[in-house]
Amino acid sequence: MSHQTGIQASEDVLEMFARARNGKYRLLKLDIEDEQLTVSACEKPTRSWEQEYDNFILPLLEDKQPCYILYRLDSQNAQGFEWIFIAWSPDYSHVRQKMLYAATRATVKKEFGGGHIKEEIFGTVKDDISLKGYYKYLACQSAPAPLTTAEEELRQIKIKETPTDIAVDTKHQTLQGIAFPIEKAAFQALEQLREKRLNYVQLKIDIKNEIIILADTTNTEVRDLPKRIPKDAARYHFFLYKHSHEGDYLDSFVFIYSMPGYTCSIRERMLYSSCKNPLLDAIENRLLMEIARKIEIDNGDELTPDFLYEEVHPKQHAHKQNFAKPKGPAGKRGIRRLIRGPAEAETAND
């Protein structure tokens, strides 16, 4: 492959690309040497991609030398395994090297196969490239666009105008959606839930560190759900609801947002409300978990089996028919009138 920079890949590199796309490798590290693209390191998969991520990638990152890293996920699309493309360009590397790697990046991706690359990360420090940095990147991707100065001023005005007397079911102004990162253990638990190795995952916000963390994964039946709802703190709950409906046995993922109202601080309520949609977006779009129903409650007593069933399968309201006007009698309308009016009586007497 020849490019604008004149960089070429050997046949050996192209063959390794092909084997990597077929799933043989977990990682390929690519360097540019003597105007050729070379593979300087490779690793084969032995565990899950998350377990191997930091151990495989971070030791390969040099403080003064750019590189590319292709890292294979365990998920697949129509073309095969999905990959993360990492462009490492440390701050202290030579400017010419930075420019060379930046100019060659697009063509390297094209040669490997853009359809296989799910995410692309650019980093100048190791924290950008670490697994935690990758999760932050995913969270930022699902976060709303930043506000302009005018929009930010308007938001602050609306927040100040909003009464602080807020109940769970009250419609109130909240902050713009905030996408806090999800810790590794929480993300892994959600993956296990998606694969039905767990049936319940509870998450909470670590407000001090601004991260969403795992709170509970206790095996849970429908009758146990009320016990899982804290009475003094907000939580996010994901439940695998196994049930029968119209003769079919179904497994449905249900999201429950519990907020016990005045026992939580205003800040906690606002943060849980603001983080909810970005979290759900990340789970539905990144983990590809289809959530059948999203429920908001203020206490666990509401979570009866009948309530949950009717939330997942709401009753269809029958069509209300308009009142039908009664039909008149068949044939002639009523008995013939026998009483004559005054004018008719005078005519008859004449």
UniProtKB/Swiss-Prot annotation:
Localization annotation: Cytoplasm, Cytoskeleton
Pfam family, one: Cofilin_ADF
Region named Disordered: 316-350
Principal subcellular localization: cytoplasm
CC terms in the record's Gene Ontology section: actin filament; cytoplasm; myofibril
ADF-H domain ranges (all copies): 4-139, 177-313
SUPFAM superfamilies for the chain: Actin depolymerizing proteins
GO molecular function: actin filament binding; actin monomer binding
GO BP annotations, alphabetical order: actin filament depolymerization; barbed-end actin filament capping; positive regulation of neuron projection development; regulation of lamellipodium assembly
Alphabetical list of InterPro entries matching this protein: ADF-H (IPR002108), ADF-H/Gelsolin-like_dom_sf (IPR029006), Twinfilin (IPR028458)
Keyword field: Actin-binding, Cytoplasm, Cytoskeleton, Repeat
Subunit organization: Interacts with G-actin; ADP-actin form.
Similarity annotation: Belongs to the actin-binding proteins ADF family. Twinfilin subfamily.
Role, per record: Actin-binding protein involved in motile and morphological processes. Inhibits actin polymerization, likely by sequestering G-actin.
Protein name: Twinfilin-1
Gene field: twf1
